[in-house]
């Protein structure tokens, strides 16, 4: 069955605009099967004061949209990778790939049709490939683009999302809700199945372009503007006073960096948050080998 799945994916990608490397996850693992990693389709939330299992330094993805703020603990996302959610009338998918360290929020609709996503069990450049349950198109998380199926070539809209600590997010968004551990799945959310991975130089799966210059797991903030890409390595941001004025493409940006909480976020010249992605350097480079890289000026 897995060999058949691998052959099918080869045929899919052969007709797509994306070259290899693709691969299923470890073939001996249930994660290699579609929905072997179960997405959360009916998320439950708690008020911040009821989230007693979260410690101040725990990592979360924080999203504010349509007047609502929500936190998604990485400890839960490590086991599920996708939360199909809603903010008012807006369908949103919050996604996290532990292999790339990338958390992203997307408007979950294409062609006016709301979508719900699952974990395909397949990877491209070590990054999770999502599938939508309506038409079964395959979507790249980092690329936000459908590589096969009825929506092939379409791209999903990114929504600004923060990757920070629970203490930081709660301090700035005291009205936040928190994704509950009551997911309907039997998982040990106190155990990190990827413990130590973010410190290792090695990758579990192949990538098309191999990054140089920084540790492969160096965290970067990646921004896109007018089809151009720029990475802001945390190692460079740490050399600044915490705020950088820069340009990405034709856009002026302000990047704020908080070393204590490991948080980097960007805003435009009007102070409006910009969608970006925080993730491992190797992953950003694998998708954007032509990326520019911010270098801190000597102080």
Give a label for each model feature.
Residues 17-299:
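Mid-to-C-terminal functional-domain signal that highlights helix-capping/loop sites
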Residues 2-26:
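Bacterial Sec-dependent signal peptides at the C-terminal "C-region" and cleavage site
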């Amino acid at each position: 069955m897995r060999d058949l799945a691998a052959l099918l994916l080869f045929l899919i990608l052969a007709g797509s605009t994306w070259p290899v490397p693709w691969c299923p996850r470890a073939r001996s693992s249930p994660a290699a099967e579609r929905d072997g990693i179960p997405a959360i389709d009916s998320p439950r939330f708690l008020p911040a004061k009821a989230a007693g299992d979260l410690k101040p330094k725990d990592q979360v993805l924080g999203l504010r949209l349509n007047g609502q703020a929500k936190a998604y603990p990485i400890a839960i996302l490590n086991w599920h990778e996708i939360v199909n959610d809603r903010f008012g009338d807006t369908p949103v998918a919050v996604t996290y790939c532990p292999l790339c360290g990338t958390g992203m929020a997307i408007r979950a609709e294409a062609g006016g049709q709301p979508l719900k996503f699952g974990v395909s069990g397949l990877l491209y450049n070590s990054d999770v490939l999502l599938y939508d349950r309506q038409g079964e198109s395959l979507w790249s998380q980092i690329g936000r683009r459908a590589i096969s199926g009825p929506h092939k070539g379409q791209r999903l809209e990114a929504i600004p999302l923060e990757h920070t600590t629970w203490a930081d997010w709660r301090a700035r968004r005291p009205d936040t809700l928190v994704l509950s551990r009551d997911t309907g799945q039997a998982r040990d959310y106190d155990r990190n199945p990827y413990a130590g991975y973010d410190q290792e130089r090695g990758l579990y799966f192949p990538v098309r372009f191999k990054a140089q210059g920084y540790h492969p797991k160096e965290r970067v903030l990646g921004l896109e503007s007018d089809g151009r890409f720029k990475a802001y390595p945390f190692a460079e941001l740490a050399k600044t006073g915490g705020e950088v004025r820069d340009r990405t493409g034709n856009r002026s940006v302000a990047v704020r960096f908080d070393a204590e909480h490991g948080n980097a976020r960007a805003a435009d010249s009007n102070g409006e948050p910009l969608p970006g992605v925080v993730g491992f350097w190797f992953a950003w480079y694998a998708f954007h080998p032509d990326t520019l890289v911010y270098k801190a000026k000597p102080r």
